[in-house]
Every structure is written in C-alpha cells, then in structure tokens.
Amino acid sequence: MQSAKQKISDMASTAKEKMVICQAKADEKAERAMARTKEEKEIAHQRRKAKEAEANMDMHMAKAAHAEDKLMAKQSHYHVTDHGPHVPQQAPVPAPAPVMGHGYGHNPTGVTSVPPQTYHPTYPPTGHHNHHHY
C-alpha cells in the first residue's frame, strides 16, 4: 500500500515540477520579448534556469520525503512498543539556499561542500608492502 502511495506522490511531485518548468519557460519567453539588449535576454535565460533547478530540487526533496514516509510506515509495523510517550522526530534539515554565482560548484567564502573529517587516508598505505611481480 505504501509503495503505491509513494508512486502516486512521486508522480504528483514530477507533474508539479513539469508545471513549474513550463511556467518558467513561458516567463522567459515573455521577458525575452520585452528585452532590448543581449544582456537582458541572457538574464531572462538564467532566471529560467534557476527556476528549473529550484523546481528539480523541490521534486527530489519531495521524493526523499515520500521514501522516508514509506520507510517509517514499514518500520512502525516491526517496532510496536508501549514503553512510554512517543517522542517526535526532529524536523528535516532545510536545503541550503541556492547560491547565485558564476560557476557550477563554487561555494561562498567559508562554506565547504565536504564535511570536516579527522580521518585522513594515505595512499599507498604505510607499512610493509607485498609486491607480487609476475
């Protein structure tokens, strides 16, 4: 039952994304028609791309939420306990605001896309090496 519910929810999210993309394309067409310079036309194009990316991100966030709902429903059948009051789960962490920059994958100063780690692997690993030459 949850699989069907997830599929329907995913289809609704995809349809919403396609609708937003279609609206963004129509907005771009109207902006380009009113634009007088090449730069204004490029700005309209970039706005459309940003709207499409945001719609795509929203769709994927919704699909992740649907998968989480399915998992929680599946797990709740296996973990039936009456050991006290239900403790609500933490709210999901909101997605970071999109960075409007000049390049793909660039982060603002002080922000990294890689979480800090204490483990620093080395290659080749230190120690005795058995090299087999055939």
Swiss-Prot record:
PANTHER family the UniProt entry points to: LATE EMBRYOGENESIS ABUNDANT PROTEIN 6 (PTHR33493:SF6), LATE EMBRYOGENESIS ABUNDANT PROTEIN 6-RELATED (PTHR33493)
Amino acid composition bias (Basic and acidic residues), ranges on this chain: 31-45
The protein's role, per its UniProt record: Involved dehydration tolerance. Involved in the adaptive response of vascular plants to withstand water deficit. May possess chaperone-like activity under water deficit.
Cellular-component GO terms for this entry: cytosol; plasmodesma
Residue runs in coiled coils: 34-70
Protein encoded by which gene: LEA6
BP term (GO), one: seed development
Annotated protein name in UniProt: Late embryogenesis abundant protein 6
Domain of life: Eukaryota
Swiss-Prot/TrEMBL keywords: Coiled coil, Stress response
Low complexity: bias regions: 115-127
